[in-house]
Amino acid sequence: MIRRTPRGFRYERFGGIVHLERPRALVFIDRDRARRLGYRSSPLWNDEPDPEWNVAKLSAPLEAHLQLTNRCDAGCQGCYTGATPTGAAGEWGLDEWKRAIDALAARGVFHLALGGGESALLPWLGEAAAYARERGLVPNLTTSGLYGDEELARLCGFATLFGQINVSIDGVDEDYARVRGFDGFARADRAVVALRRATKHVGINCVVTRGSFDGLSRVFAYAKKRKLREVELLRFKPSGRGIKTYEALRCTDEQHRALVPTVLKLSRKHRLRVRLDCSYTPMVTHHRIKPKLMQWLAIYGCAGGDLLVGAKASGMLTACSFAPPVESRVDGIGDYWESEGAFGPFRRWREAAAEPCRSCEYLALCRGGCRVVTMHVTGDATAPDPECPRVMAWRAEHGVTTPRRLPVVT
């Protein structure tokens, strides 16, 4: 049975977006289909529609990633926020985040991705999730599971408020310790078991690294054993403490080229839904999947500042969770979204594209790769993703070396 959510439709220049609860999906439809569903007119339809359905021209992001706190006791070596036991200066409280949720709801955002730090430590997390539901947004949660019985029991008590809860498990047993720098797998597993008893909408977030890539089969087998809904794989980013550990933990070119066939094989074997974060799109295009199919599956590259936005614990707006803040707070997104130069290089990917991206058939989908990786490696966020297999092959063929920024040692 197909069921729409309370925020069932949002007008866009190309037509609109239908938000479904069953099956869970955001469905992009053209103006004719929207009219047939009863949506008659919008100021966004005054101009002729873009024949390419350019999603870079959305009226608002689809989702917002809110770092509710930068407090976390774990101390993971690659933490992309650089979280600490004391958190960050100027962190917002519940009232400020409610104001942000109001602004995002007014803009027509569909989903919230709530995280940290470790947001399960916040006594008001459940209130924030409930408020998002009241305002018509679907809150989702990422959690480490590395906290005490009291916090876990509290989270399980309102777990059904979330559309999806993903526990961060970057490997099984020794692979977990290899990525995180300590052995916390048993505690994370304990959280998975408890949360799965509270709700069926539980999955895994897995950051893939050089040392854990070969252990992906164990991650999928674990997810199947625990009857989880999905496995989401994330590329390791040079952000937070990950800046210092990036060279040691990032995957090799061989691993990046093997990612898609490996994941497809494991997904079929274990009959699990798998998601790849947007920074992996260059590794998908390497296998020359038809662009029309990628568009139909909504596989896009760097979505920061367009399909999604982020916010730091202080409320400062970011293009994505891994990017530095811009000169606006998230509760001011209504004005900033339409402003000239908003999100800088995250929106300039088309006009700034250099070869081989400029002539690549996948540019409109890949968008030049991950801006955060590119900025860290080359010093230029608009340059082609230096780890894209197609970029690496082109540079090898043309005798072009990848520009690399000198590391900053602190």
Q: Which residues does each PLM region occupy?
A:
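Short, acidic, Ser/Thr-enriched surface-loop or helix-capping motifs
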Residues: 311-312
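Iron-sulfur (Fe-S) cluster-binding segments and ferredoxin-like electron-carrier domains
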Residues: 81-90, 324-327, 363-398
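Short, basic/aromatic recognition patches
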Residues: 290-300
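Radical SAM/AdoMet-radical enzyme domain recognition
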Residues: 89, 94-116, 121-252
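Short Fe-S-cluster ligation motifs
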Residues: 103-116, 383-410
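Short, small/polar residue-rich loop motifs at catalytic or cofactor-binding pockets
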Residues: 302-306
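C-terminal accessory region of radical SAM enzymes
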Residues: 253-291, 316-368, 377
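N-terminal pre-core extensions flanking Radical SAM catalytic domains
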Residues: 1-86, 105, 405-409
